[in-house]
């Protein structure tokens, strides 16, 4: 407590009461999660005030309930004491610590689970166990099915045997008008998957998956959205000050994207054990939970080393390679966090790109390899494509080769 408060009387006052001894543990926990001293002081003062309120209400330690958090905050509000953003979370975190220490066994009540949500859990487990789909894929599928079920059954009982082809078509028509083409394709894929799952369980006998209409999609109809190769180096060079922890982190992330063509989610999910320093390799967990071991370029290794030695916070038990810069210091959540790093890097480099996400670095690497003479097969191996058809789109950006195939204009050029 001496790290937060200098006045001995303040510390003694905060430790009074049957729960006062847990204030010190709470302070240690806050520091471990990377909260700054000012934030820690505020949270500790709230916890101590919460303890005093419990004492005044004659609520024993083993009688503390989740509802008491709301009652306490309302009491503060009525007494004219301001409630700041984050106060509720601070008191709840202290209450969680009490539960972890077995001081109180009552858990925060969860909202009732609807039949649709119960079925979604079973479907998600099926995707994980039976189909071996990655969390990223499941996160994309499940919300669409949630909308489908709520739209058909509401919050009441779900009877899949009542589903008909018209229900499927109605949902597709209604939802497709609100989405871009790629999302429509994802939605119909998810819907077919769920309807096969329902038939697999015996909930339906009809093959309703066959009723999901096909969506027109020409995989080679557009060009890959990539940065011009000449703009990649300025993006890396204009990373915010590398003398800061955040700057070193962002430079390491951008180096992985630009040099290895990794997907944003793959970068965000890296853990410390994925780096094989002895053999200069890095393990990448891609689609379908497949693990690939890629050689680690020297500049990428140097960027990661700089971040690990002078940037990455030391958080006990946290194995993610890249951590948030603000408390709580946890690992990145999904590819959106990596995409945010890319977006800000492009803005700092003053590059006006139609795409702001991380995937454009992947396209740029492939286009650069093609221009330097690499075959589509070699590019597919680097990008870890399952099918050659996925790599075939990059043939469209090889303008020199395509120019030689163009037929001359009839009658010559005027």
Model-derived segments and spans:
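Conserved catalytic core of the tyrosine transesterase superfamily
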Residues: 1-414
């Amino acid at each position: 407590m001496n790290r937060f408060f200098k006045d001995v009387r303040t510390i003694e006052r905060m430790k009074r009461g049957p729960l006062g001894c847990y204030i010190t543990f709470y302070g240690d926990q806050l520091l471990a999660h990377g909260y700054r001293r000012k934030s820690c002081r505020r949270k500790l003062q709230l916890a101590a005030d919460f303890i005093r309120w419990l004492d005044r209400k004659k609520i024993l330690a083993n009688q503390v309930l989740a509802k008491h958090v709301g009652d306490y905050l309302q009491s503060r509000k009525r007494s004219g004491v301001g409630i700041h953003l984050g106060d509720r979370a601070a008191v709840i975190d202290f209450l969680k610590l009490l539960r972890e220490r077995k001081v109180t066994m009552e858990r925060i009540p969860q909202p009732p689970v609807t039949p649709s949500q119960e079925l979604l859990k079973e479907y998600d487990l099926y995707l994980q166990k039976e189909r071996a789909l990655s969390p990223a894929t499941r996160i994309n599928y499940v919300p669409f099915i949630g909308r489908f079920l709520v739209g058909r059954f509401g919050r009441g009982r779900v009877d899949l045997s009542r589903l008909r082809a018209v229900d499927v078509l109605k949902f597709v028509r209604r939802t497709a008008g609100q989405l871009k083409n790629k999302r429509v394709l994802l939605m119909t894929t998810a819907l077919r998957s769920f309807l096969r799952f329902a038939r697999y369980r015996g909930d339906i006998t009809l093959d309703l998956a066959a009723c999901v209409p096909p969506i027109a999609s020409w995989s080679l109809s557009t060009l890959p959205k990539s940065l011009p190769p000449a703009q990649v180096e300025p993006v890396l060079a204009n990373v915010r000050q590398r003398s800061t922890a955040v700057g070193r982190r962002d430079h390491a992330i951008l180096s992985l994207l630009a040099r290895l063509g990794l997907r944003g989610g793959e970068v965000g999910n890296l853990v410390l054990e994925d780096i094989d320093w002895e053999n200069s390799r890095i393990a990448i967990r891609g689609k379908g939970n497949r693990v690939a071991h890629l050689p680690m370029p020297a500049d990428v290794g140097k960027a990661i080393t700089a971040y690990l030695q002078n940037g990455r916070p030391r958080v006990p038990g946290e194995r993610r390679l890249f951590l948030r810069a603000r408390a709580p210091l946890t690992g990145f959540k999904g590819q959106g966090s990596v995409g945010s790093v890319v977006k800000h890097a492009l803005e700092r480099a003053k590059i006006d790109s139609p795409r702001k996400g991380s995937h454009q670095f992947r396209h740029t690497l492939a286009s650069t390899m093609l221009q330097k003479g690499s075959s589509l097969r070699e590019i597919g191996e680097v990008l870890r494509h399952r099918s050659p058809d996925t790599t075939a789109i990059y043939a469209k950006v090889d303008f020199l080769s395509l120019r030689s195939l163009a037929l001359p204009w009839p009658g010559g050029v005027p």
